[in-house]
Amino acid sequence: MMEDPLIPWLTEHGLVCHPHTLSGAPISLGSAFQLAGLKLAWRVEIEQRRVWIVLIQRVEQRRGLKNPFAALYMLANAARAVLGPDYYLYGNVDVLAGSSLSTQRLAHFYRRWTGAKELSTGWFSLKVSQVITLSNMKKRQNNGFA
């Protein structure tokens, strides 16, 4: 696997990145960092112009997440800065373990409020240039723009 182009940017912004493997296997599936109570793992696919989100996992006890989208927002910022605005975040939507939120409701959120496209059942794609902060998303919602 090639060197991940996002790691230098993420490191400069205070994150510690490491290889992501499945159950400790020696084969890397991508890279990962932890932020705001979540572990986010991804891999960059240059040919497809996408950042594939491999895993989002709660790493702290469920005490409420400060911002459940902080890790995704950070990854999108890195992709936009390093790869350019025409790359996409891509991944399968599933709720975090122990969440009372349904997968259908989370999928609706991604479609309605973020503008993500559902390419096939449960698989979403969102251009990194369209990613906005949670506070801006709430402002859009409150002003009727979402």
Curated annotation (Swiss-Prot):
Keywords: Calcium, Plasmid
Calcium found in the keyword field: yes
Pfam families: LcrR
InterPro entries hit by this protein: LcrR/CesD2, T3SS_LcrR
Its job: Involved in the down-regulation of lcrGVH transcription in the presence or absence of calcium and is necessary for lcrG protein expression in the absence of calcium. Plays an important role in the regulation of the low-calcium response.
UniProt-recorded name of the protein: Low calcium response locus protein R
Organism: Yersinia enterocolitica serotype O:8 / biotype 1B (strain NCTC 13174 / 8081)
Lineage of origin: Bacteria, Pseudomonadati, Pseudomonadota, Gammaproteobacteria, Enterobacterales
Protein encoded by which gene: lcrR
